[in-house]
Amino acid sequence: FRVGAGDLKIGYAGRMIKANAAYYGKQWHLEQIFPIDGLGAKAARDVNHQLHQATAAMSRRKYVKQGEYIPNFAMIDQHGEFLQIRQLQGKPFVLNFIFTRCTIPTMCPASSIRMADMQDAAREAGLNGLQFVSITFDPAFDSPGILNQYADGYGMESKNFHLLTMNQTVVDDLLRQFGILTMEEDGTINHTMATLLVDTNGRVAYRKEGATWSTKDFMEAATKLLLK
């Protein structure tokens, strides 16, 4: 089987995976590779079951606003590792939603450029504790391997940048929790946008709606958190 560059980089040697097999170009290919093994997988199921129950009980107009705490959730990062968001507790992080097939320059591509620029700015400013989290809208396409390639394409350094994917149920729960609206139309995903700065205790310290947020505003807010 042939695999994509991102999956090849991850490796998955000795791990249990699920994947789709496809035959084209006179070769078999493995696509949509997701790990399904280990304690991380079981913990993720338990955490996300609680997330789903909490989301189902939410009122229609409820979502996480500035000053409120985000729920715990578990996803898989661009290295094929399970991550619970509470593992970042103690470190502030910037969170947004993107999908790799987005073709509107002012939406996901622009947001990812700003996230990568902010990572560079944080490193240059010595704000080494600041983390970055991007969650995909499109888990049907955005496997860990695809996100791995996406990170490389935008120059995102993996040590403190987490690109996350999971099944559609988890993604849908998070979209509702964070007040993001999506609609599939003409082969793409139309969506609203929000970018959040989450403090060391899991509380939203700053939230900006829309696609035109400023890295300067987020850097100023993050600096205040890290220099407290």
Q: In which residue ranges do the predicted regions lie?
A:
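Short nucleic-acid-contacting surface segments enriched for D/E, G, S/T with interspersed K/R
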Residues: R2-K18
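N-terminal "domain-start" segment that seeds a small globular fold
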Residues: A13, P35-I85, I113, D117-D120
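Short, charged beta-turn/beta-strand-edge "cap" motif at the junction between a beta-strand
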Residues: N20-H29, F34
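Solvent-exposed coil/turn segments that connect beta secondary-structure elements
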Residues: A22-Y24, F99-T100, F137-D138, M156, ...
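Structural micro-motif
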Residues: P71, K159-F161, D172, R176-L196
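Short active-site neighborhood of thiol/selenol oxidoreductases, capturing the structured segment around
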Residues: P71, L83-R114
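Structural microenvironment flanking redox-active thiols in thiol-disulfide oxidoreductases
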Residues: A110-L174
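Thiol-/selenol-based redox modules, centered on thioredoxin-like
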Residues: D120, L181-K228
